[in-house]
Amino acid sequence: MTYGNVYVAQIAMGSSDAHTVRALQEAEAFDGPSLIIAFSHCIAHGYELNEGPDHQKAAVNSGYWPLFRYNPAKASKGENPFSLDSKAPTIPIDEYLASEGRFKVVNDQSKATGEAAPAEGSVLANVRHDVNARWNLYEQLSKGWRLA
């Protein structure tokens, strides 16, 4: 997105079919390179694959995987090229991380300290910070703030 001439979208098919289709159609129609970053569940995530769509929704709803589209063609029309297509997080990131076996070390470290809130510098505290910082950046971009 910092180059300003590449279509970029982040999708999660299990979270929103409509968003996925819209992003793929825009990417195909864009006259230039396009990049689609797709959330793809797998057995190594530590849950049954038939639960994949639910986990994708949780990833989006926790802010771990925000849905967005960046379409440079909109900028040439005077429109904001960045669209933040998911709502602000509605579930705690801790809840999402606890639902997946791949994040077991994060959850175990948090439980080992015995503290209600993760200690500063812990993996969980860093994940919370990163999720919040990324969400805030995307929110600013959706309001017209420019990367470059």
Annotate the PLM regions:
Residues 13-21:
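Active-site glycine- and acidic-residue-rich loops that bind
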Residues 20-140, 145:
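Glycine/aspartate-rich loop-and-adjacent alpha/beta segment that forms the canonical ThDP
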